[in-house]
Each structure stands twice: as structure tokens, then as C-alpha cells.
Amino acid sequence: IANLTYDDSNKTRDVLLLFNLLTLNNSTSSLMRFPFDNYKKEQWDLEHVHATAGGPPTDKEVNRNDSQAISPSASREMFFKGVLGLLTNATEDNRNENRLDSSEIRAVEDFLNRGNFDEQTCQKFWEQYQTSIENKLGDQDSIDNLALLPSKLNRGYGNVSFIEKRRWIINADRDTTFIPPCTKNVFLKYYTDNPIDFTLWSHEDREAYLSGPYGIITTLKSYLCDEKDE
């Protein structure tokens, strides 16, 4: 399961569908049943939870996100700290063939140390380093960065920041658009213990979504073991 990617679209979609079904089935407090009729009528896409192409959140994005109780500058600082964490983990991951030298890490560290996170400064830095950072990160297409969304909703997103995509998901759910429960959980960071950063889908968030106590592997493994016992 951990090796599934966007390119394995049918298998990955099936695994995420089963994950949603089992999550609902395992929830003793949930009165919701999975709407198979709606699922069959819709076309479904694999949505990247977070594509770093969205860049640091803008003032407007932060201010209209009612879940954020911090300033736009603080949100952008958290974004770059998250990027630094992703870069650091990429250098330590022996599975990543595209190993990083220290230049991108050093650039982000220096930027963080300067402490200026106004919108224009952050956008200028991101425009300068975005391509090299994204080329070195890799693994944007792995299952721990994917979720199910209706095609008509997904294709309206484009490259937006995580905080903006999160706002759209919440609003779509409020407007009674069916959003799979695990997709909602992802953008609410339900799988992450004590989440404080809603600007970026971090390495820790991905690990919790994939392998945490309520994550994909744990949920499916429990189901498959029960099936085997029967």
C-alpha cells in the first residue's frame, strides 16, 4: 500500500475507497452510510492533498480562513518551516534517489532566520527557489499525499495553497457536496496528533495519514486480518 502512487490510479482509488468505507463502518458514533448512488454517478479524481506549487499562503487566503487564529506572517513562517521539514526528511530518505545537497535547505534556513514574512518577500523567495525545491522533494504522487474528490470539484482547484484548498473543502461540505469522510479528515488534520500548522501537508501529517492508528495501513490491515480469521 505504501508504494502506491498517482500512476497506479485504479488501485490507489480502490484502496482509498475501501479506506473511506471502513472508516465509516468503524465509527460507532457515525449515523452516516456511504452514499454508493452518489459515488456511482460522480467521476472521481485522485487529489493531491498538497502540491507545494501553491506556495506560501497570501494575506487574503489566511484572513478568510476562519479556522486560523494566527496572522498571515505567522502562517507563512509555518509554511516555510514545513517546507524545511520536508526537505530535511527528503535528504534522510534512502528511498529517494534524488538526494539533496544542502543548498535548498540552507536557503530556506537563511530565509527563516531573516524573519521577514510579509507577503511580497515570501512570494519573491518562493518564485526564486520553487522549481529547485520541488524538483528535489519528489514523492508528490505517493498515496500519503492523495485523497478522493469529485472531479468537478477537483478540477476547479489548480495550484492553490493547502490553506486555501482546505477552505474550499470545508465550504463544499457545508454546501452539501459529498466529500468522502477521509478526505475531510485529511484537510482537518484528524490523523495528526495536536496539529498546529494548517499551511502545509507536512512529513509528519503524511506519516500519520498512512501509518497512524486511524490511518490507511492500520485500518486496512485490521479489516484484512478480520477477514482472514473468519
Tell where the protein language model's regions lie, with residue ranges.
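Intrinsically disordered, low-complexity N-proximal targeting/linker segments that flank membranes
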Residues: I1-K124, G138
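Long, cytosolic, alpha-helical-rich C-terminal regions that act as interaction/scaffolding modules
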Residues: L86-E230
